[in-house]
UniProtKB/Swiss-Prot annotation:
Role this protein plays: Catalyzes the reversible conversion of 2-phosphoglycerate (2-PG) into phosphoenolpyruvate (PEP). It is essential for the degradation of carbohydrates via glycolysis.
Taxonomic placement: Bacteria, Bacillati, Bacillota, Tissierellia, Tissierellales
Any GO BP annotation: glycolytic process
PANTHER family: ENOLASE
Family annotation (Gene3D superfamilies): Enolase-like C-terminal domain, Enolase-like, N-terminal domain
Name under which the protein is recorded: Enolase
GO MF annotation, one: magnesium ion binding
Active site residues per record: E205, K337
Organism (species): Finegoldia magna (strain ATCC 29328 / DSM 20472 / WAL 2508) (Peptostreptococcus magnus)
Length: 428
């Protein structure tokens, strides 16, 4: 046993210039763990609560001094003397201390910062990397990157309704090679956009947000970039999309302004079936709204054996909502965002539940990120097989990829990279 002797939080900034919480945990043996909490742009209504000060005189109301004070003035005193290796006990106690269903009293940003810093301090105490501490000898699978290279929806100001268009370089023999493939496609995409005199500035997650005319033009442009990079779409590189459909769901219909169309759930399903037939799409995230359970069930029946259907806003990394999805036969994959649920233990529980029922898990960043690389370690530790952490642009995204390169080097010959086999639950 090694006791926690101090817990300290401060207000720092994320990649969008918004305040967030950083927490440090110290042990009696001299170990230290530090974690910075990310923040989302499009958030599901069922997510754990990110506590903001709502004081318009500071950071336009986005300050997090209340969450910081909750760590320094309440949580810290409770954890002093606690065994740093008792991750489950600490996380469960933090949930109990908060006392709400959605962590709205102390704030999920306060609780998660502490939870992750505890894990990092424990790893430091053991002389281990975080992925080794969480995953043990079995944590050795490098994830296929899901790289956001074109943006629409809430992430852009253009005529594209679908929020994210991503590439998945499945053709590499290892993570390092796949990262290179994805990077080369990204640079070729920039050249394609430049040749059309389109904007090549990057957004929050490092993707381009040019003024394209439609969702299909975005897909066509990506296919062109893949080919120009010297790779074969559908073999070396697959496409994934995040529709973020809750953002354009109104009064039971899907209002896709870019397509000048208002669609029902059934019409959205036909729309996706058509896209999957025409383009090398392997994964659709948030294809329907977060509470359109019946629509999701139909979508899964129609496409669930052919492509990955990822629940993000639908599941919000929540075991209860995932269990409902499993029982209804909804989706075949879950997006894992640590700050949606608020503790490391609950995150690992969600991944484990997904795996037990044949669902894949995609470890994900948020729009507001930092230099913190926790998700890279979690992806390897849990053998998730996939990571969504932006394009190969912006240091807040690159740092996760660089951490994965380091981990792959450390694992040497024991490292595993599954490529297309990461979609083990598909029939095609």
């Amino acid at each position: 046993m090694s006791s926690i002797i101090d817990v300290y939080a401060r207000e720092v900034l994320d990649s969008r210039g918004n305040p967030t919480v950083e927490v440090e945990v110290y042990t009696e043996a001299g170990a230290m763990g530090s974690a910075i909490v990310p923040s989302g742009a499009s958030t599901g209504v069922h997510e754990a609560v990110e506590l903001r000060d709502n004081d318009e005189k500071r950071f336009l109301g986005k300050g997090v001094e209340t969450a910081v004070d909750n760590v320094n003035l309440e949580i810290a005193d409770e954890l002093v003397g606690w065994d740093v290796f008792d991750q489950v006990g600490i996380d469960n106690y933090l949930i109990e201390l908060d006392g709400t269903e959605n962590k709205s009293r102390l704030g999920a940003n306060a609780i998660l910062g502490v939870s992750l810093a505890v894990a990092k301090a424990a790893a430091d105490e053991n002389g281990q990397r975080l992925f080794e501490y969480i995953g043990g000898v079995n944590g050795k699978t490098l994830p296929v990157p899901m790289m956001n290279i074109l943006n629409g929806g809430q992430h852009a100001d253009n005529n594209v309704d679908i929020q994210e268009f991503m590439i998945m370089p499945v053709g590499g023999e290892n993570f390092k090679e796949s990262l290179r493939i994805g990077t080369e496609v990204f640079h070729n995409l920039k050249n394609v956009l430049k040749s059309r005199k389109l904007n090549t500035a990057v957004g929050d997650e490092g993707g381009f947000a040019p003024n394209l005319e439609s969702n299909e033009e975005a897909l066509q442009t990506i296919v062109e970039a893949i080919k120009k990079a010297g790779y074969e779409p559908g073999k070396d590189v697959m496409i994934a999309i995040d529709a973020a459909a809750s953002e354009f769901y109104e009064d039971g219909k899907y209002n896709m302004a870019g397509d000048n169309a208002v669609r029902t759930s059934d019409e959205m399903i036909e729309y996706y079936k058509n896209l999957v037939e025409k383009y090398p799409i392997i994964s659709i995230e948030d294809g329907l709204a977060e509470d359109d359970w019946d629509g999701w069930k139909k979508l899964t029946q129609e496409l669930g054996s052919k492509i990955q259907l990822v629940g993000d806003d639908l599941f919000v990394t929540n075991v209860k909502r995932l269990q409902k999805g499993i029982e209804m036969g909804v989706c075949n994959s879950i997006l894992i965002k640590l700050n949606q649920i608020g503790t490391l233990t609950e995150t690992l529980d969600a991944i484990e539940l997904a795996k037990r029922h044949g669902y894949t898990a995609v470890i994900s960043h948020r729009s507001g990120e930092t230099e913190d690389t926790t998700i890279a370690d979690v992806a390897v530790a849990t053998n998730a097989g996939q990571i969504k952490t932006g394009s190969t642009s912006r240091t807040d995204r690159i740092c996760k990829y660089n951490q994965l390169l380091r981990i792959e080097d450390m694992l040497e010959s024991t490292a595993v990279y599954d490529g297309i086999k990461t979609f083990y639950n598909l029939s095609k």
